[in-house]
Swiss-Prot record:
Major site of localization recorded for this protein: cytoplasm
Residues that bear Phosphoserine: 68
PTM field: Hydroxylated on His-39 by MINA.
Keywords recorded for this protein, A-Z: Acetylation, Cytoplasm, Hydroxylation, Phosphoprotein, Ribonucleoprotein, Ribosomal protein
Function field: Component of the large ribosomal subunit. The ribosome is a large ribonucleoprotein complex responsible for the synthesis of proteins in the cell.
UniProt GO MF annotations: RNA binding; structural constituent of ribosome
GO biological process: cytoplasmic translation; translation
Positions of post-translational N6-acetyllysine modification: 47, 55, 110
Lineage: Eukaryota, Metazoa, Chordata, Craniata, Vertebrata
Modified residues ((3S)-3-hydroxyhistidine): 39
Descriptive protein name: Large ribosomal subunit protein uL15
Assigned protein family: Belongs to the universal ribosomal protein uL15 family.
Alphabetized PANTHER family for the sequence: 60S RIBOSOMAL PROTEIN L27A (PTHR11721), LARGE RIBOSOMAL SUBUNIT PROTEIN UL15 (PTHR11721:SF27)
Gene from which the chain derives: RPL27A
Basic residues: compositionally biased ranges: 1-30
Amino acid sequence: MPSRLRKTRKLRGHVSHGHGRIGKHRKHPGGRGNAGGLHHHRINFDKYHPGYFGKVGMKHYHLKRNQSFCPTVNLDKLWTLVSEQTRVNAAKNKTGAAPIIDVVRSGYYKVLGKGKLPKQPVIVKAKFFSRRAEEKIKSVGGACVLVA
């Protein structure tokens, strides 16, 4: 049968209020902070902080990661890297200065040869060119410029 009063109400008038005579509800009965995470607080640590204890794997200190990082772009996507205005201007004056497309600024390193280029010269700057990409750019009167 449920009780009508809460425990705190029942303990009114009792000096120690259920906390004993000696310690008087003081100090740190379970240890301070994260003490006992492997022992008496084990359940809490396993449930809410899995993987808190222990080591995993080995550390390779002077490892050079991903040296083969080389994002690529194909010729058919090359004109999408420049603004619409540049495309319109290049189409209008065929004899003027060729537009420069810097693929490195757009986050690519290598130009690959898939697709066709429109018949207007263009200067492409990149770190690497595939053989077929270089042939196609030069066939429309463009130039391939290697950048560091």
